[in-house]
């Protein structure tokens, strides 16, 4: 009961926030920012609140945002707030307010009002100080959540604009150190793990850096993030994706203040990135930077910039070629000329410029300006002098480039001229003809044309080609000059004046701009028509027939053509606005036929004004836009009527009129290009108001299909079109479910002429395939029936391509269940007709069975039936039978018909039967998943399958039938209930299985792989076999098959299918136990071989037996199932018992079992090596190995593996020893047989260590020795000692392998524990080598931590058990190594091992040896830096702690020398005598430790022993250096007075008398201080602090003595004259106040007061102010005792009331207030 109550009380105390410990409460209350703890402990909350509220009010005056906290944290009620009384929710709210206040006040932490306000938070709300920086960094490195909290705090402050340099500097430093530490911690030698670690690190700190880099208002945090990103790039293995992301984010967020450091960061990131162009975002940002190249040149003096410059230049070139950004050209030129790039990079960039020059086209450079600029740059760069010019010229030679040719190619006027000359068919003039001759030739041509009269009404008629070609040739020659074009336009043959009534003029130009002619000619044609339509005689005409051709021009690839077409449409739009009536070309536009389906005025206006004109600008930009516009206008616009403001909704009638209008022109125009381009839009319109495109365009398809092959070739060649493209466009006019269209398509397919045009045939079938998903069910059925009939009825010689396409169509489209049923049902009639003949004829032919079979085989009808059946069944199999389970009854019927047919023709028809069976098998999952699908059990499907199995000789058919039976057994057991067991009985008998196996063996095939499907059928049927028959049935099966070959396969397939469940483990274990031990071990070996086969690049047997898709996940899943079974099989108690019995017999059979055991062990070890990277599988191998090792006793195990240890394969021998190591771990220490066997094996292990040359093998042997010795070593010390000698010798510890050395040292450390004094003979060899290796481990850039730790472990064991063996010379070397180790900044584990060892040494080694070694080692420690010195002092302190007073007193000489050297450290460091620099902060920490260690020594000395040391110290500090070394003396005194401050502060009144030794020195320092020297000024402060401590703790009247008081007091008062150079309030005033309190004499007070009052009339305001503040402090501290001299003070006080300095005057008033408070009366009357 009492214990229960105590436990409850302990739990309550642990969870309680209330403490009843008065000392603890007082200590908590005394924590203050402002006051000493002893002062703070006596303060009330009201006093603290009053002072803190004053500071809060001042903060509110500085920043109004603080006012909000006046009602919460600084309210009157806050004095009553007590965290102990608050609940968790209230404390959380309070924490949130405190955190918010600290965010805001953070930037003002150095202001006194802020300190006062925070004082209230600390005292009232217990908001304590933060942990030291080193702890923060260490925790942030190891705990990412802390780093995240610090980062979020900093980012929140920055978002709220509450940041300040201290916060940003703190975050940047911690983040940088933490990132560096995390990179070191996550470093791995394996690439995959390293990549994963880098990914994790980026996930942890990447988002923080990403946000920090874009805080443009906080440049400091951006620069800090640049530093951290640089560390990540330099030390982390970041890929290019991450580096590019950081670079993009950097340029996204930089500004004018951060672009320079950002550019440096970019350079560093680029150097760690692959040499490729930077992203477009970076290029876009850098192109805006002023003086980019000069800045890069400046940066290149300190950092490599070549990769950034290279990537930037390539990105600029890409922008130039794709976007025409010529701003980047000067930057590219400057980068190439600035010597920032290597020769290879210069070549690549220049060649890229050449390529860009050729890529720039009219879309990027319409006026040729960009090409001219590029050409100028290329030429100027090629003429550059120096090395850069040489490299560029060599690049030009490599690409065989001609600068003059480039000038020509980049000229703006060259390309159009060349295009005209190359495109004209009549350009027959010689290449060297002069321009004058060309002009004369063109003039004569015009004269000839003037006599020519048009022979046709329109150039769009069928008979206009000759005249059009002649005129077109002249046009192409005249298009280059406007004057020539004017002459051409006016020739009589064109009939320009008659253009409104005669369509020849306009139709000529229409045909030109729609034809395959140069861009300039098309533009000229469009311009001519535009100018003509602007004339007055065109105002009363309706030129709607031109609109389709304008739409064609709007889809031209050339932008100039589209622009000219847009201008022409705009003119047409202006004509439409007029009241026009007469339609141009209405009668003769196409010769005898006029323009079809003319539009009325409103429809025309809607087409032009609402459809075409609003989209002209977009159509000019994109050639496909006009197609989309027409489709959008013609389609039903319910949802798009308001999408574009410039277009209005078109009515059904309007859209139908436009649709018919365009279709009419498509049908009538002779130009294929016009047809094709307009069909792009029309073929996207299904129908309008019931009128489909097929209705209107079917004549076009018939016309095109009626053309002969030669005519098609001629037409397409004339217009430079692809025949297949035209075929497809024309055929696409057919829509799904259109009866006439489909009928036309079917007629064309059946037409023999169509077969001569394969492209057209292919287009028709492609169209049917495309329409198939949109067809109705009956249409699909009729189409499929038609296609199927084609494949069966047409002649392959005449319609070969058609039949091929029909077959492909049926294979590609998704055949519905009804279609497939129709096809299958047609087979039954076909087979019936083919096999049944009239009775008399059948009797006449079938005289014998053989003759009947021959007759049927020669029957063409039967052959056709077989072909048809084959095709149908292939279609069914390819149509995913799983989705058509309704076919199952028909397929079973077909299978039955095939059996009947096979008996007639004398062939098994195995292929056809296999098709049916595979389709049926695919349907089984559907019947299993869908309960609505049922199989009729009365039909006899099982009998059919049994027939397949029993009568077929095809293995494929038998296997498929067995699989189907197994599936039916799971899905519909009733179907095969009567048939499945006869099948098993039949297959299990000796009539089939043995012959089958023999056949496979004779053919040299793998019998297991060949019978895989057979085995699978039995495994599948396992769950349907009665439980009482399962064991016997499968035992019989395995015995018939042969257990040595098939038992492992059965087991593997069982566990693969049903997993290693409890039932399956029990069943398989029973099966295994039914066979001999030899068979069981062989089976286990083969199981392991099968599992190993899974992981081969090309699995063989495992892929056959276990399947799998080859993926990593699937492979691991399959292997896991197998390895889950293996440990259970090995754990079989019966197997272990039988093996144990055999081992006791020790005969030949036992030897065979040992061999199999060794092979099994080898297989497990090999497999474990294979799956080492897969944790789950590796663990399963470990379980199996554990169970295998337990099968034999350790003695038998060693006998079994002896053969393996004799193998030449060193890797195998090493694995065997590792297995032995595992077995040793599991052995009991109490088993004598195991102990004897293992100790007897030690000599063999030492022999391995001596004789083997393989280091890994030696390493494993040493590990085994370590394990055996640790467990059994104390039972046979001689054997262990022999092993220790071997390990310490040259064969092991003396080897060059680092890992072996590490293991040897660790093993020796264990052997020291076992042997203790018995290992002494080995140590003269082992200790020097250990120290040598320790020294080697610290040499080089990367210290060897493992060797380092092992050496320290060995030495630590020696120090713990036999410390007397560590002599002075060994200790000197060890301490020197420890200094180097401390300076090397190793990981935590290494540092812990080192300090652990040194702690043992400090505690256990003889003190004289230890202190002498430390004395001799000081120089080494100080030369290694702060870390080594700090650790040195820690060890010294521990050595002082652990040894007695007598030991310390005996070695005081060595210790005093150590402390004198230590106190001289500051001087040696500052003067540069130290080899390693130590920062001032580190020096401060070291001197604090020196003081602490000195106190530890002092505590163990008496006064008689220590006083001479103290005297010597002061003498050494004051006179130990030459007189001319003033700075050295100052630094030495600095350290000494730092110690004295600690000395007097800790020992207090005990050592007051020691102050007599420092008076002279202190007076000298105070009298001679040069305040311009920072060191002397700081020493001055230390002296005052030390004196203050002496005065404060004087309890013996030491300073009342006139000699002591008189020596110090005048000098102290004289220091007020230095108030202008130093702050008197910090140290001087407290010291003087303490002196006055210690003096405690009226005479001394009068002397002090008189001297101080004299300084009140000093001319310096700072002196007067300091004295007034000193008087205030004296008044407060001494009260009336000091105010006895008030009469002397009053005149001075009165004078100070009118002082020239306001501050002095204000402080004087405060002094008066203090006096009045002490006296209790006013001074006004006295001062008057």
UniProtKB/Swiss-Prot annotation:
Protein name, UniProt field: U3 small nucleolar RNA-associated protein 10
HEAT repeats: 540-578, 881-926, 986-1024, 1191-1229, 1235-1274, 1622-1662, 1683-1721
Source species of the chain: Chaetomium globosum (strain ATCC 6205 / CBS 148.51 / DSM 1962 / NBRC 6347 / NRRL 1970) (Soil fungus)
Principal location: nucleus
Gene name of this polypeptide: UTP10
Location in the cell: Nucleus, Nucleolus
UniProt keyword Transmembrane helix, yes or no: no
Protein task: Involved in nucleolar processing of pre-18S ribosomal RNA. Involved in ribosome biosynthesis.
Keywords annotated in UniProt: Nucleus, Repeat, Ribonucleoprotein, Ribosome biogenesis, rRNA processing
Keyword Amino-acid biosynthesis: no
Gene3D superfamilies xref list: Leucine-rich Repeat Variant
């Amino acid at each position: 009961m009492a214990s229960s109550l105590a436990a409850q009380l302990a739990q309550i105390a642990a969870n309680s926030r209330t403490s009843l410990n008065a000392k603890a409460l007082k200590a908590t209350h005394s924590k203050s920012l402002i006051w000493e703890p002893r002062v703070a402990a006596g303060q009330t909350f009201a006093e603290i609140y009053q002072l803190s509220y004053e500071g809060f009010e001042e903060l509110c005056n500085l920043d109004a945002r603080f006012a909000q906290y006046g009602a919460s944290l600084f309210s009157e009620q806050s004095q009553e707030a007590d965290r102990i009384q608050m609940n968790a929710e209230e404390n959380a709210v309070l924490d949130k307010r405190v955190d918010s206040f600290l965010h805001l006040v953070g930037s003002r932490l150095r202001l006194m009002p802020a300190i006062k306000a925070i004082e209230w938070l600390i005292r009232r709300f217990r908001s304590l100080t933060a942990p030291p920086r080193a702890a923060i960094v260490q925790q942030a490195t190891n705990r990412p959540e802390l780093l995240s909290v610090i980062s979020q705090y900093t980012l929140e402050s920055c978002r709220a604009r509450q940041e300040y340099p201290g916060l940003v500097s703190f975050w940047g430093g911690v983040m940088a150190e933490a990132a560096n530490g995390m990179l070191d911690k996550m470093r791995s030698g394996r690439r995959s793990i390293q990549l994963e670690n880098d990914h994790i690190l980026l996930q942890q700190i990447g988002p923080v850096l990403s946000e920090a880099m874009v805080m443009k208002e906080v440049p400091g945090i951006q620069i800090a993030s640049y530093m951290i990103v640089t560390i990540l790039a330099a030390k982390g293995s970041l890929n290019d994706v991450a580096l590019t992301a950081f670079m993009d984010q950097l340029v996204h967020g930089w500004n004018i203040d951060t672009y320079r450091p950002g550019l440096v960061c970019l350079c560093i990131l680029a150097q760690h990135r692959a040499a490729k162009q930077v992203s477009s975002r970076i290029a876009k940002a850098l192109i805006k930077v002023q003086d980019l190249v000069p800045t890069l040149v400046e940066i290149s003096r300190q950092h490599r910039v070549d990769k950034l410059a290279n990537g930037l230049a390539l990105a600029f070139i890409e922008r130039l070629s794709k976007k025409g950004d010529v701003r980047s050209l000067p930057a590219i030129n400057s980068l190439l000329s600035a010597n920032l790039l290597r020769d290879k990079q210069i070549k690549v960039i220049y060649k890229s410029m050449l390529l860009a020059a050729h890529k720039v086209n009219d879309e990027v450079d319409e006026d040729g300006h960009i090409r001219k600029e590029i050409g100028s740059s290329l030429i100027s760069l090629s003429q550059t002098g120096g090395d850069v010019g040489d490299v560029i010229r060599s690049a030009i030679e490599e690409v065989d480039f001609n600068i003059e040719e480039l000038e020509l190619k980049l000229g703006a006027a060259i390309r159009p001229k060349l295009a005209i000359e190359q495109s004209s068919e009549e350009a027959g003039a010689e290449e060297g003809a002069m321009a004058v001759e060309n002009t004369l030739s063109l003039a004569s041509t015009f004269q000839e044309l003037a006599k020519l009269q048009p022979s046709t009404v329109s150039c769009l008629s069928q008979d206009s080609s000759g005249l059009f070609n002649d005129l077109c040739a002249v046009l192409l020659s005249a298009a280059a000059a406007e004057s020539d074009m004017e002459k051409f336009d006016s020739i009589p043959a064109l009939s320009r004046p008659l253009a409104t009534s005669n369509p020849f003029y306009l139709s000529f130009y229409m045909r030109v701009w729609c034809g395959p002619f140069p861009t300039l000619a098309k533009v000229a044609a469009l311009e001519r028509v535009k100018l003509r339509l602007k004339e007055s005689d065109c105002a009363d005409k309706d030129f709607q027939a031109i609109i389709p051709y304008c739409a064609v021009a709007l889809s031209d690839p050339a932008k100039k053509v589209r622009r000219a077409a847009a201008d022409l449409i705009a003119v047409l739009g202006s004509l439409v606005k007029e009241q026009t009536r007469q339609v141009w070309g209405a009668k003769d536009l196409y010769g005898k036929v006029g323009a079809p389906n003319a539009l009325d005025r409103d429809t025309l206006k809607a087409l032009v004004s609402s459809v075409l004109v609003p989209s002209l600008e977009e159509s000019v930009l994109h050639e496909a836009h006009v197609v989309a516009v027409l489709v959008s206008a013609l389609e039903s616009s319910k949802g798009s009527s308001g999408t574009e403001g410039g277009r209005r909704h078109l009515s059904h009638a309007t859209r139908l009129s436009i649709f018919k209008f365009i279709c009419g022109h498509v049908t009538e125009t002779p130009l294929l290009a016009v047809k094709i381009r307009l069909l792009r839009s029309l073929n996207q319109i299904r129908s309008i108001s019931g009128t489909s495109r097929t209705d209107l365009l079917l004549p076009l398809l018939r016309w095109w299909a009626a053309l002969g092959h030669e005519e098609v070739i001629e037409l397409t060649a004339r217009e430079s079109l692809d025949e297949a493209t035209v075929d497809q466009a024309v055929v696409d006019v057919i829509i799904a479910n259109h009866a006439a269209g489909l009928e036309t398509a079917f007629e064309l397919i059946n037409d023999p002429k169509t077969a001569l045009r394969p492209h057209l045939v292919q287009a028709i079938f492609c169209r049917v395939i495309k329409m198939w998903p949109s067809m109705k069910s009956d249409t699909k059925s009729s189409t499929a029936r038609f296609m199927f009939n084609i494949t069966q009825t047409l002649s392959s010689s005449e319609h070969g391509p058609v039949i091929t396409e029909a077959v492909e169509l049926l294979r590609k489209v998704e055949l519905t269940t009804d279609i497939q049923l129709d096809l299958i049902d047609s087979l039954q009639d076909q087979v019936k007709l083919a096999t049944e003949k009239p009775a008399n004829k059948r009797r006449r032919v079938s005289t014998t069975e053989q003759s009947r079979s021959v007759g049927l085989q020669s029957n063409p009808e039967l052959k056709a039936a077989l072909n048809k059946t084959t095709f149908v069944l292939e279609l069914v199999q390819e149509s995913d039978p799983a989705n058509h389970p309704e076919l199952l009854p028909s397929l079973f019927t077909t299978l039955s018909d095939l059996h009947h047919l096979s008996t007639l023709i004398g062939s098994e028809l195995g292929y056809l039967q296999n098709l049916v069976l595979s389709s049926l098998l695919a349907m089984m999952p559907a019947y299993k998943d869908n309960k609505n699908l049922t199989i009729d059990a009365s039909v006899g499907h099982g009998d059919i399958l049994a027939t397949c199995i029993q009568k077929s000789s095809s293995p494929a058919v038998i296997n498929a039938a067995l699989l189907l039976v197994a599936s039916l057994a799971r899905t519909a057991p009733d179907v095969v209930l009567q048939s499945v067991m006869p099948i098993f009985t039949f297959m299990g008998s000796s009539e089939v299985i043995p012959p089958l196996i023999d056949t496979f063996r004779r053919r040299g095939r793998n019998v297991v792989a060949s019978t895989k499907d057979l085995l699978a059928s039995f495994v599948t049927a396992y769950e349907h076999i009665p439980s009482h028959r399962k064991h016997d049935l499968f035992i019989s099966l395995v015995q018939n098959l042969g257990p040595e070959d098939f038992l492992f396969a059965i087991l593997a397939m069982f566990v693969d299918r049903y997993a290693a469940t409890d039932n399956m483990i029990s069943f398989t274990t029973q099966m295994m136990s039914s066979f001999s031990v030899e068979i069981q071990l062989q089976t286990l070996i083969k199981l392991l071989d099968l599992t190993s086969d899974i992981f081969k690049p090309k699995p063989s047997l495992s892929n056959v037996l276990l399947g799998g898709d080859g993926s990593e996940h699937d492979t691991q899943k399959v292997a896991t199932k197998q390895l889950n079974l293996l440990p259970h099989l090995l754990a079989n108690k019966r197997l272990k018992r039988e093996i144990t019995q055999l081992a006791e017999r020790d005969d030949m059979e036992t030897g065979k079992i040992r061999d199999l055991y060794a092979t099994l062990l080898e297989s497990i070890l090999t497999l474990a090596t294979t799956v080492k990277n897969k944790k789950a599988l590796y663990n399963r191998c470990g379980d199996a190995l554990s169970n295998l090792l337990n099968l034999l006793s350790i003695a038998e195990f060693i006998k079994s593996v002896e053969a393996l240890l004799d193998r030449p394969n060193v890797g195998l021998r090493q694995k065997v020893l590792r297995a032995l190591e595992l077995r040793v771990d599991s052995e009991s220490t109490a088993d004598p047989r195991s102990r004897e066997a293992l100790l007897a094996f030690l000599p063999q292990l030492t022999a391995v260590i001596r004789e083997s040359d393989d280091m890994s093998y030696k390493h494993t042997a040493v590990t085994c020795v370590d394990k055996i010795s640790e467990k059994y070593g104390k039972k046979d010390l001689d054997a262990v000692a022999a092993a220790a000698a071997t390990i310490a010798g040259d064969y092991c510890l003396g080897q060059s392998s680092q890992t072996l050395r590490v293991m040897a040292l660790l093993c020796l450390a264990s052997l020291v524990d076992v042997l203790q004094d018995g290992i002494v003979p080995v140590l003269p060899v082992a200790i020097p080598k250990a120290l040598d290796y320790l020294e080697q481990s610290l040499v080089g850039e990367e210290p060897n931590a493992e060797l380092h730790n092992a050496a320290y472990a060995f030495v630590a064991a020696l120090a713990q058990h036999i410390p007397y063996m560590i002599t002075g010379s060994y200790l000197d070397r060890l301490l020197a190594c420890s200094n180097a180790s401390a300076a090397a900044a190793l990981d935590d584990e290494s540092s812990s091992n080192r300090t652990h060892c040194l702690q043992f040494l400090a505690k256990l080694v003889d003190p004289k040896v230890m202190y002498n070694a430390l004395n001799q080692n000081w120089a080494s420690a100080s030369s290694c830096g702060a870390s080594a010195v700090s650790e040195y002092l820690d060890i010294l302190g521990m050595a002082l702690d652990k040894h007695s007073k007598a030991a310390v007193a005996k070695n005081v000489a060595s210790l005093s020398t150590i402390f004198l050297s230590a106190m001289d450290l500051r001087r040696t460091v500052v003067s540069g005598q130290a080899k390693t620099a130590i920062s001032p902060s580190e020096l401060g920490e070291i001197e604090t430790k020196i003081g602490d260690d000195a106190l530890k020594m002092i505590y163990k000395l008496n006064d008689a022993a220590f006083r001479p040391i103290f005297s010597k110290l002061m003498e050494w500090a004051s006179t130990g250096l030459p007189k001319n070394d003033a700075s050295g003396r100052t630094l030495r005194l600095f350290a000494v007075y730092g110690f004295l401050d600690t000395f007097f502060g800790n020992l207090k009144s005990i050592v007051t008398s020691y102050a007599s030794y420092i008076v002279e020195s202190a007076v000298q320092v105070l009298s001679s201080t040069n305040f311009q020297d920072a060191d002397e000024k700081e020493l001055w402060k230390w002296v005052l602090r030390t004196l203050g401590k002496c005065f404060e703790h004087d309890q013996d009247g030491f300073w009342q003595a006139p000699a002591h008081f008189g020596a110090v007091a005048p000098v102290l008062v004289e220091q007020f004259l230095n108030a202008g150079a130093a702050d008197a309030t910090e140290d001087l005033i407290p010291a003087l106040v303490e002196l006055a309190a210690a003096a405690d004499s009226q005479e001394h007070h009068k002397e002090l007061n008189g001297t101080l009052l004299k300084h009140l009339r000093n001319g310096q305001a700072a002196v007067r102010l300091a004295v007034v503040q000193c008087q205030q402090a004296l008044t407060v501290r001494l009260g009336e005792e000091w105010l006895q001299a008030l009469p002397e003070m009053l005149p001075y006080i009165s004078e100070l009331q009118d002082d020239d300095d306001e501050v002095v005057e204000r402080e004087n008033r405060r002094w008066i207030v203090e006096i009045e408070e002490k006296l209790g009366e006013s001074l006004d009357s006295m001062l008057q």
